[in-house]
Curated annotation (Swiss-Prot):
Organism, as annotated: Vibrio campbellii (strain ATCC BAA-1116)
Keywords recorded for this protein, A-Z: Cell membrane, Decarboxylase, Lipid biosynthesis, Lipid metabolism, Lyase, Membrane, Phospholipid biosynthesis, Phospholipid metabolism, Pyruvate, Zymogen
One of the Pfam families matching this protein, by short name: PS_Dcarbxylase
Protein name: Phosphatidylserine decarboxylase proenzyme
Cofactor: pyruvate
Gene: psd
Protein's job: Catalyzes the formation of phosphatidylethanolamine (PtdEtn) from phosphatidylserine (PtdSer).
Length: 285
């Protein structure tokens, strides 16, 4: 059965299905929208008590519900300049060292930092022998992504690709899953060196947005595109730890890359363990 499920991933019209779902999720359908939201809350056991607006009727579209804000104080940010915090409510998929330019996708499956970063060999070299973590956002999670530390945006890269579903089954069976799916790479300069925060798309992830640039995808491109940002001035993007940096409209995965000897992961990190945005993720070395 698993082989059939994975095989279907190669045959379904990934981009067409995602466009359709994106349009439906953005449609204002009144009572139908409310009914779908109520079903989703029940189906995935979504905690609406922590949402700024807990009544499903508040949301005009499903996407508005999906990227719902939380109440003030719902996610306190761990204090301390050396404390790096979780960027999202998620589940730890994999984490550890980047060895020979390779990241672990699942048992028996690796992928390269260079491919993840859109084929940029020079950029990948910055993270040689560094550390990585892959965090999977489930449907029930809060889908805004925040900064794990203070950072100044250096570059944003759009990398076109497939839209395979992202879950343990595909991670174990689809080679180079995270390096072949569509993604937006954000490179920040921090006190401990460069850090990458990569937002990876998936089937029915209708949109990836950034707070400084709005919607990056759709429309979906056919080639890698890069935006460079200044470190100072009106066009500089400087974000504090805990500030929102992006969001998924129907979610997927966040991958962080850290340079060599920059951080040590918090002792609470464990594959398969849920994460809470703002709690300790790693510590500067």
């Amino acid at each position: 059965m698993d082989k059939i499920k994975v095989g279907l991933q190669y045959w379904i019209p990934q981009h067409g299905l995602t466009r359709l779902v994106g349009k439906l999720a953005s449609a204002e359908a009144g009572g139908l929208t409310t009914a779908v939201i109520r079903w989703f809350i029940k189906q995935y056991n979504v905690n609406m008590d922590e949402a700024k607006h807990s009544d499903p009727k508040h949301f005009k579209t499903f996407n508005e519900f999906f990227v719902r804000e939380l109440k003030d104080g719902a996610r306190p940010i761990a204090e301390g300049d050396a404390v790096i915090t979780h960027p999202a409510d998620a589940c730890v998929s994999q984490f550890g060292p980047i060895e020979d330019g390779q990241l672990i996708q699942a048992k028996g499956h690796n992928f390269s930092a260079q491919e993840l970063l859109g084929g940029d060999a020079k950029l990948a070299e910055e993270f040689q022998d560094g550390s990585f973590a892959t965090l999977y956002l489930s449907p029930r999670d809060y889908h805004r992504v925040h900064m794990p530390c203070d950072g100044t945006l250096r570059q944003m890269i759009y990398v076109p690709g497939d839209l395979f579903s992202v879950n343990p089954l595909t991670a174990e069976n689809v080679p180079n899953l995270f390096a072949r799916n569509e993604r937006v790479v954000c490179i920040f300069d921090t006190e401990f060196g460069p850090m990458a925060q990569v937002l990876v798309g998936a089937t029915i992830v209708g949109s990836i947005e950034q707070v400084w640039a709005g919607t990056i995808t759709p429309p979906r491109g056919n080639s890698v595109y890069k935006w460079d940002y200044p470190a100072e001035g009106d066009k500089a993007v400087i974000l504090k730890k805990g500030e929102e940096m992006g969001r998924f409209k129907l979610g997927s995965t966040v991958i962080n890359l850290f340079v060599k000897n920059a951080i040590a992961f918090d002792e609470s990190m464990e594959n398969g363990k849920p994460t809470v945005m703002g709690t300790p993720y790693a510590h500067q070395q």
